[in-house]
Amino acid sequence: MKDAILWNKLPGGKVECIACSRRCKIPDGSKGFCFVRQNAGGRLVLANYATLEAIQIDPIEKKPFNHYMPGSYVLGVGTSSCNWGCLFCQNHNISKERDIKGKEVMPEELVALAKKYKTGSIAYTYNEPTIFIEYALDVAELAHKHGLKNLFVTNGYMTKEAVHEMKGLIDAAVVDWKGNGEQKFSNKYEVVVSNEPIKEALVELKRSGIHVEMTDLIVPGVGDSLEACNSLTRWAYDALGPDVPLQFTSFHPDYKMMDYPDTPYETLKAHYDIAKKNGLNYVYIGNAPGNPYESTYCPGCGSLVIGRYGHYLTEWKLDREKRCVECGTLIPIVGGPPKKLSYRDIELVY
């Protein structure tokens, strides 16, 4: 347990948490929607500080980042619970956990693990990192001192105040839309009343100098509106620019939506086509290994510049300045090239 940041005192012993956009108003002795941010005698505390339910080494493309340190490996960590209520959550074993469980790993221990396993970064992932932001930022500060980068894998439902705290400590964030951000879908399947805070957070993240990428989980039949895709990608072009990476990912049955099918490839390709038509240069299709759109192509000449199969790199056709070797177009990639293009077994640390 640790004193939280990002909260206000309210009358009657209540506190308002301002880490995520739910802005829960919490009576003394109670917890917010996330079940880990708690009012303890009129002060907000993080009840699961440094208590991790998942610690694992992954390819960075699994997060998924396609334009940040491609080909590298990341130490991913997550805790209990979440600030959303997704009915399809693939990590529901930890995100729906209401008891605080896991292994205590203090910031210095986590950084030591990252160095031991020779990862270039630490990702706060598996559940929503905004709810354990105090721990993430404590780790991030120490990680920077050891030359490690810090990554948020987030639903983006964070406040501007939270982004302000992240500035200078979090290096990159991938924001995971679901169902094209269509509001009826979010209301019913995510327990989210408005997606506007996500858009505000994305703009604020970019303004703060944090590298931003996006994913969009396409759920067949209920979260695959092409009209909503058109709206979201037009907004992304206008607000974030043509070079923001966007990956459409395939749904698979999980948690309370086991009776829904996998997303047809044709549906993903239709979304891809709309995003490209709306001017986005770097659009991907994920969770469909072997498809041509998991690779990066030069917007100048169309040549393949980074080849991928699943989460692994197969080709690198950029020069030292990250320019396409065919036409010289500068490709917005942070980091790389990898030392070698090879498969490394995913290691379960805890």
Q: Residues of each region from the PLM?
A:
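Ferredoxin-type iron-sulfur electron-transfer modules and their immediate structural context
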Residues: M1-E61
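Iron-sulfur (Fe-S) cluster-binding segments and ferredoxin-like electron-carrier domains
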Residues: R23-A47, N91-I100, V305-H311, I331-P337
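Conserved Radical SAM active-site core
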Residues: N39-A172, L341-Y350
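Short, conserved glycine- and acidic-residue-centered signature motifs
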Residues: P70, K103, S194, P264, ...
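Conserved AdoMet/S-adenosylmethionine-binding subsite of the radical SAM
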Residues: P107-E266, I274
